[in-house]
Amino acid sequence: MSAQRLISNRTSQQSASNSDYTWEYEYYEIGPVSFEGLKAHKYSIVIGFWVGLAVFVIFMFFVLTLLTKTGAPHQDNAESSEKRFRMNSFVSDFGRPLEPDKVFSRQGNEESRSLFHCYINEVERLDRAKACHQTTALDSDVQLQEAIRSSGQPEEELNRLMKFDIPNFVNTDQNYFGEDDLLISEPPIVLETKPLSQTSHKDLD
């Protein structure tokens, strides 16, 4: 070590004569590194597993104790409590006057029933009006036949006039008929392809 210090002193003196900068260095002997303390224990994995399992069990124990303190209900207990609550509410509400919500719900049911009966009555009224319309059309056909027979026209003209179904009246009352009911629901009348001039000539002959 004394020789090293002498070398360092000499170098420092020479450098000091050249400039103000001093440069010194020393050598240290590094001994062999031993890894004996860093070696893993033979049962370190087993010890770590059991320690982790113990920590997990303790943690779950605290979690379960907190859940039981908050009072999380079980399903069986919840169903029995709901049944008891329903029975108690029924018994308590049996003697009380009706609440406004229940009254409104019953009024809504009654209104829906009245609307349904009104709809049925309207349908029956429409059916009756259609039946009356058909009977009046038949009566008008019979009256037309009698008038033509009394006038003495031939049977061909009678048959020709019978093809046309002309209603005697049109009811425009909107209370009984809708817009679709005013339309004639009978099939369209297909006229013969013969022109009227030929038929008139045949009648004259």
UniProtKB/Swiss-Prot annotation:
Single GO BP term: protein localization to plasma membrane
Q: What is its main location?
A: membrane
State the compartments where it is located. Cell membrane; Endoplasmic reticulum membrane
Q: GO CC annotation: what is one? A: endoplasmic reticulum membrane
Topology in the lipid bilayer is annotated as: Single-pass membrane protein
Q: What does the UniProt entry list as the effect of changing residue 115 to V?
A: Found in a patient with obesity; uncertain significance
Quote the InterPro entries the UniProt record gives.
MRAP
Q: Where are the transmembrane segments?
A: 45-65
Q: What domain of life does the UniProt record list for this protein's source?
A: Eukaryota
* Keywords for the protein's UniProt record, in alphabetical order: Cell membrane, Endoplasmic reticulum, Glycoprotein, Membrane, Obesity, Phosphoprotein, Transmembrane, Transmembrane helix
Gene Ontology molecular function terms on file = corticotropin hormone receptor binding; identical protein binding; signaling receptor regulator activity; type 1 melanocortin receptor binding; type 3 melanocortin receptor binding; type 4 melanocortin receptor binding; type 5 melanocortin receptor binding
Glycosylation sites recorded in the entry for this protein: 9
Tissue distribution is: Expressed in the adrenal gland and brain. Not expressed in other tissues.
Residue positions, PTM Phosphoserine: 89
Q: Does the keyword Iron-sulfur apply?
A: no
UniProt lists the family membership as follows: Belongs to the MRAP family.
Subunit and partners: Homodimer and heterodimer. Forms antiparallel homodimers and heterodimers with MRAP. Interacts with MC1R, MC2R, MC3R, MC4R and MC5R.
Q: What job does this protein perform? A: Modulator of melanocortin receptor 4 (MC4R), a receptor involved in energy homeostasis. Plays a central role in the control of energy homeostasis and body weight regulation by increasing ligand-sensitivity of MC4R and MC4R-mediated generation of cAMP. May also act as a negative regulator of MC2R: competes with MRAP for binding to MC2R and impairs the binding of corticotropin (ACTH) to MC2R. May also regulate activity of other melanocortin receptors (MC1R, MC3R and MC5R); however, additional evidence is required in vivo.
What disorder is listed for this protein?
Answer: Obesity: A condition characterized by an increase of body weight beyond the limitation of skeletal and physical requirements, as the result of excessive accumulation of body fat.
Tell me the protein's name.
Melanocortin-2 receptor accessory protein 2
Q: What is the native source organism of this protein?
A: Homo sapiens
Q: Which gene encodes it?
A: MRAP2
